[in-house]
Amino acid sequence: MAHRPRWTLSQVTELFEKPLLDLLFEAQQVHRQHFDPRQVQVSTLLSIKTGACPEDCKYCPQSSRYKTGLEAERLMEVEQVLESARKAKAAGSTRFCMGAAWKNPHERDMPYLEQMVQGVKAMGLEACMTLGTLSESQAQRLANAGLDYYNHNLDTSPEFYGNIITTRTYQERLDTLEKVREAGIKVCSGGIVGLGETVKDRAGLLLQLANLPTPPESVPINMLVKVKGTPLADNDDVDAFDFIRTIAVARIMMPTSYVRLSAGREQMNEQTQAMCFMAGANSIFYGCKLLTTPNPEEDKDLQLFRKLGLNPQQTAVLAGDNEQQQRLEQALMTPDTDEYYNAAAL
């Protein structure tokens, strides 16, 4: 295996300081070396257990410490989750992600989580989960059930992290990523722009991710969604160009990773999203809600895909099982009519 050089903070800072158009040009060149620039991975995220989380993440409406009006819900029944997965597949998603508001999963819930993974995989979808901290045995059980990806974000730089979260250390997050990797599960890990961090902190986050023994296969870059009742509700808005710049630097530093536009897309206009794709983003969450915050509706995404000439990426599925791909491709070729806008909900 070829030696992979480690990034330094000064190198990453230099990327952030490049003229934006030069940075975008470099990022697009890197992107085209490893990916089809017209292909975008489409994923769906479902909250399988909502609210009442004991953590104190200052951005999160699911924390039990903040009064956001969010109603806590118990872990969903397995069949409810699988029905949502069927709908996601019919709408064109190729990966189904399941998120639970926990510090860590309880052992009593593991059999249900395993059944969810097995059921999603049986549909020909990729399965992803985000459940908090994992033990080695839990990671291995999920791997044995067939889990493809595990999401556990670093959120920000090690230096700024303590300003946002105190109930889980940065090292705990790194340890969970290591356990997931050792179990043979692919890693999904990224962060949030807009927490009040500096450009140096954004560089520090990407430095941590890119310098992992193996960089994450998937890197979600979130724009802070400000929720009333959370400590960050009054944070300044993120400048669109600053966000696009972060996407571009992530693409250059992790050339073979999927860079995902995650939370905050509802706040972005089409032009901003288009520039994110130009900067190297090639994955989105598809659907009307990301856990507990809004996300663009499916029909808006299909419309944007058509305008930009983008296509949903196919995934390896069971032989002959390409129904969701055909459905989405048909929707992409349909004019802007009432029928088109209903296509994603079929």
Swiss-Prot record:
Cofactor(s) needed for function: [4Fe-4S] cluster; [2Fe-2S] cluster
Record text on cofactor binding: Binds 1 [4Fe-4S] cluster. The cluster is coordinated with 3 cysteines and an exchangeable S-adenosyl-L-methionine.
GO BP of this protein: biotin biosynthetic process
S-adenosyl-L-methionine as UniProt keyword: yes
Keyword terms of this UniProt record: 2Fe-2S, 4Fe-4S, Biotin biosynthesis, Iron, Iron-sulfur, Metal-binding, S-adenosyl-L-methionine, Transferase
Binding site for [2Fe-2S] cluster: C97, C128, C188, R260
Principal EC category: transferase
Alphabetized PROSITE patterns for the sequence: RADICAL_SAM (PS51918)
The EC number(s) this enzyme carries: 2.8.1.6
Pfam family, one: Radical_SAM
Pathway(s) this gene product operates in, as recorded in its UniProt entry: Cofactor biosynthesis; biotin biosynthesis; biotin from 7,8-diaminononanoate: step 2/2
Residues reported to bind [4Fe-4S] cluster: C53, C57, C60
Catalyzed reactions per annotation: (4R,5S)-dethiobiotin + (sulfur carrier)-SH + 2 reduced [2Fe-2S]-[ferredoxin] + 2 S-adenosyl-L-methionine = (sulfur carrier)-H + biotin + 2 5'-deoxyadenosine + 2 L-methionine + 2 oxidized [2Fe-2S]-[ferredoxin]
Stretches assigned to the Radical SAM core domain: 38-256
N-terminal signal peptide: none
Keyword Iron found: yes
Subunit structure, interactors included: Homodimer.
Functional summary from the UniProt entry: Catalyzes the conversion of dethiobiotin (DTB) to biotin by the insertion of a sulfur atom into dethiobiotin via a radical-based mechanism.
Protein name: Biotin synthase
Gene source species: Escherichia coli O1:K1 / APEC
Gene field: bioB
